[in-house]
């Protein structure tokens, strides 16, 4: 995830089949793909004891699932999603007061830019670690506050890497994680590493159709679609998924993600 499954690069597309419109892609992200990272969110929140008293800012918050999980623990949440207005709209819909903890209702901000000045945040999450380089958010956290950065684990422990290699890394696509990616991003952001962990995040889908939709929703294949066409990219993804199709037709790909906790000096 450095670049990650949540990186989205708008492009034009070529090919015989038109690509899904952005709203459909965002819904596929929200309904299929985003939940694959729930174990990562839970591990980070458990380690940092997220709950009442936590003031959390989520960077590149997608359609808001990680924020919803923090709010259900009692955290006051804010999130920014500058890359996808469609995902941001879904986050706003998902994070209505009826859906989550009443403790956080009065403190919620969801937008495409940083929130207005308010009480410093006690936690910043960048489950797409590259978001920390795009957004000057560290200044909004209190001194000593943890910042969570996350990314893919070793390629040999991530079955999905066999599929993601079809994406073009030179055009916003995926590349294998390097050992010190997260530490390098933390250093560039002026943060001090203070612990790390690994989490199993298997990608499980009801079938190949669901898997293709979920993977395409990441935006990582946009350049490939532009170059080769939607039909060809769909075909190649299905071929790459074949070893992971189970007897009942479901798709199961074991993966490991890594997270780093860094501190605001």
Predicted features and spans:
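Conserved class I S-adenosyl-L-methionine
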Residues: 2-54, 84-100
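Conserved catalytic/acceptor-binding region of the Class I
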Residues: 144-206, 222
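Local beta-strand N-terminus motif with an aromatic residue
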Residues: 53, 120-121
């Amino acid at each position: 995830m450095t670049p990650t499954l949540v990186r989205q690069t708008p492009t034009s597309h070529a090919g015989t089949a038109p690509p899904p419109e952005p709203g459909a892609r965002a819904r596929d992200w929200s309904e299929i793909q985003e939940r694959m990272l729930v174990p990562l969110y839970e591990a980070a929140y458990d380690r940092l004891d997220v709950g009442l008293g936590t003031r959390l800012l989520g960077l590149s918050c997608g359609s808001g699932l990680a924020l919803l999980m923090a709010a259900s623990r009692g955290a006051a949440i804010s999130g920014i999603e500058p890359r996808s207005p469609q995902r941001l709209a879904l986050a706003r819909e998902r994070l209505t007061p009826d859906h989550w903890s009443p403790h956080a209702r009065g403190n919620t901000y969801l937008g495409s830019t940083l929130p207005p000045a308010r009480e410093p945040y006690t936690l910043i999450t960048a489950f797409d670690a590259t978001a920390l380089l795009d957004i000057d958010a560290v200044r909004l956290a209190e001194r000593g506050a943890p910042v969570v950065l996350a990314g893919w684990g070793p390629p040999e422990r991530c079955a999905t890497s066999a599929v993601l290699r079809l994406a073009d890394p030179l055009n916003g696509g995926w590349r294998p994680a390097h050992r010190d990616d997260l530490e390098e991003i933390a250093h560039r952001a002026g943060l001090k590493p203070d612990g790390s962990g690994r989490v199993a995040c298997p990608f499980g889908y009801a079938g190949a159709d669901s898997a293709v939709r979920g993977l395409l929703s990441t935006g990582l294949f946009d350049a490939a679609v532009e170059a080769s066409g939607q039909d060809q990219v769909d075909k190649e993804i299905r071929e790459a998924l074949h070893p992971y199709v189970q007897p009942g037709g479901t798709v199961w790909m074991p993966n490991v993600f890594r997270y780093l906790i860094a501190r605001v000096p």
